[in-house]
Structure formats: C-alpha cells, structure tokens
A protein has these predicted regions:
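Pyridoxal 5′-phosphate
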Residues: 1-328
Length: 328
C-alpha cells in the first residue's frame, strides 16, 4: 500500500506513544475508583494525580476540572446547564455562526425549547469583534458561547477580550469557550481567558478518543448533565474511564515537554504555504496569521471535494471541512 501523508490533525491526532503506554498500564490496573478496597484506592489515587496534571495545563484548580467522554459532551453540558442556571434573568443565548456542531446543534435544540439564540456572523476573514458581541447583549442574556480556534479556518477568536467585556457589562452572564482546537496549541493556560466554562478534548493532542474535560470556574453551580452514581463530585456520573484519563494526562505531559513545539508548528505552516503558493499562484489563504496548526486555503476554480478526492488517491490526507460532520 502506498504510504499515506496525514495533514488532518485538526480532525484527530495520532495517539502519542506516551499515551499508549499510560493507557496500557492503566488497563492492567483495573480497579474502580469508587471502590473502598486497595484496587479502588489505587485507581482513585491515579485519577487524582492525572486530574492535577490536566488542571495545571488548563491553569485551574483540580476541583474545577471534570472529566467527560469528549468535547461534544462538554459543550452540551456547559450550554444546556449553563443556560438554565438563571431562569429569572431570561432565555437569550449568544454564540457565533462558525461554532462547532456540538455548540450549534445544541443551541438549535434549545431554540426548540423556548430559548432565543443570536448567531454572530463573522466577516469575510472569519473574524468576530468584541463590539459585535457587546452590541448583541440584552438584559435577558444568560449565556455566551464562543470557540477559541475555529476548527476549519484556524481563525483565533478574541475570547479573552470578549469575556472581559461581557463580565464588565453584565457579570451575571455565563461565558463558555469551546477550546478543543486551542488546548496546548496556543501559548498560555486556558483559565486566563476569563471564561466560566471551558471545554477540552484529548484526541486533538495525542490522547485516545473518548476522553475530554470541562473546566467549571469556582462558584459556578452547574447541574449535572448525566445523573447516576455521583462520580466527579456528583457532577458527572459514570464510572471514571481510568485508562483514558491516564492517557490524557500522559499526552498533556508529552506535549508540554516538547520545547519549541509552537514555533516549529508555525514554521511548518509557513513552509507549507510558501510551497503551495509556488505551485498554485491563484491560491487564497484563510487565517494566515492565526492558529499555527491549521492551514486553510481555497483554490479558485476547483471544487473542494474534487481536490480532496484527487489528493486522497495520491495518498495525501486533507479535508474540505470539519471531520466532526461525517464524510468531510
């Protein structure tokens, strides 16, 4: 079989060897963290240590970080429960038209349940401004949801100044950030963004699929989305996925230990764009100076699905949109 060249890390990243080793080791340590005997205590201690690792990377306290199955679960939890947190205030939500489907489809479902949602439209470069957001605020606004990095274009949205502006205008408005594409891909901890709720996912940084986390800022009384045995301090029921959690923590340590990764990624993007411009003079670049790990271009006169198919036939893996929608 022809060797494949993989260019779609925004869809998922290969599982890091460190994560594989941690996963395998944890699978052999099979105890349930809720059990009170030795196997359970060992598992609980491992989860505690892994939570501390991920929390440090996010920039929050371990008690503010709750493990989930994926970014979609985190987004659903944050938006559905965040929107209902202050029912007397109102039922108005603000988000952007370029969010991940986990946010957009959840907002559409809430619209069917009586909420009103304002979708901020980006300019032709994919950007949203602070002024757009503050102009959309209303007395009945209860929640704002804005992604950090767009998974298709690589545009970095102004989450930090937007969160600051929202809190200055109305501290009662909750601010959620889907940071799945930004976690450990941009400098600085996510907690500095000033959001009340932040979603992350493991498989974008080399952990296996099936593990993510939601940062819930201290003082935000979010109700659980999943009820049952009361795991995760009663906020996310279900036996903890100890092996996936261990792999996530291992991936976090591996990424953080990779000195110069951001500069190296930016250099690869710059090199790729320079070669593409040489080959295709009419190439149009989207978000050239934004996220270093996403390179989005358009080829005037060519249909994207044709380009994807032709490159795929030659062993080059690229996408024409979000792989979070089936078949793209």
């Amino acid at each position: 079989m022809e060797k494949l060249v993989y260019f779609d890390y925004a869809a998922t990243a290969p599982v890091r060897p460190e994560a594989v080793r941690a996963l395998t080791d944890a699978l052999e340590r099979f105890g349930n963290p809720s059990s009170r005997y030795e196997y359970g205590r060992q598992a609980a201690l491992r989860v505690k240590e892994d939570r501390e690792t991920v929390a440090r990377a996010v920039g929050c306290a371990p008690g503010e970080l709750f493990f989930t199955s994926c970014g979609t679960e985190g987004d659903n939890w944050a938006i559905r429960r965040g929107a209902e947190l202050n029912p007397r205030k109102g039922k108005h939500i603000i988000t952007t038209a370029v969010e991940h489907a986990a946010v957009l489809e959840t907002c559409k479902d809430l619209e069917r349940r009586g909420y009103e949602v304002t979708y901020l439209k980006p300019d032709r470069t994919g950007r949203i401004t602070v002024e757009q957001l503050t102009a959309a605020l209303r007395p009945d606004t209860v929640l704002v949801s804005m992604m950090l990095v767009n998974n298709e274009t690589g545009v970095v949205l102004p989450v930090e100044p937007c969160a600051r502006a929202v809190k200055a205008a109305d501290p009662a408005v909750l601010f959620h950030c889907d940071a799945v594409q930004g976690f450990l891909k941009l400098p600085g901890p996510l907690a500095r963004l000033g959001a009340d709720l932040v979603t992350i996912s493991g498989h974008k940084i080399g952990a296996p699929k099936g593990i993510g986390a939601l940062y819930v800022k201290k003082g935000v009384r979010l109700r659980p989305l999943l009820t049952g045995g009361g795991q995760e301090e009663g906020l996310r029921s279900g036996t903890e996925a100890t092996a996936q959690i261990a792999a996530l923590a291992a991936a976090v340590r591996a990424v953080q230990g990779d000195a110069g990764r951001l500069e190296r990624t930016a250099a690869v993007k710059e090199y790729t764009l320079s070669k593409l411009r040489e080959a295709v003079p009419r190439l149009e670049v989207i978000s050239e100076g934004d996220a270093p790990h996403i390179c989005a271009v358009t080829l005037p006169g060519y249909k994207s699905e044709v380009v994807v198919r032709v490159l795929g036939d030659r062993g080059v893996c690229v996408s024409s949109g979000s792989a979070c929608h089936r078949g793209r």
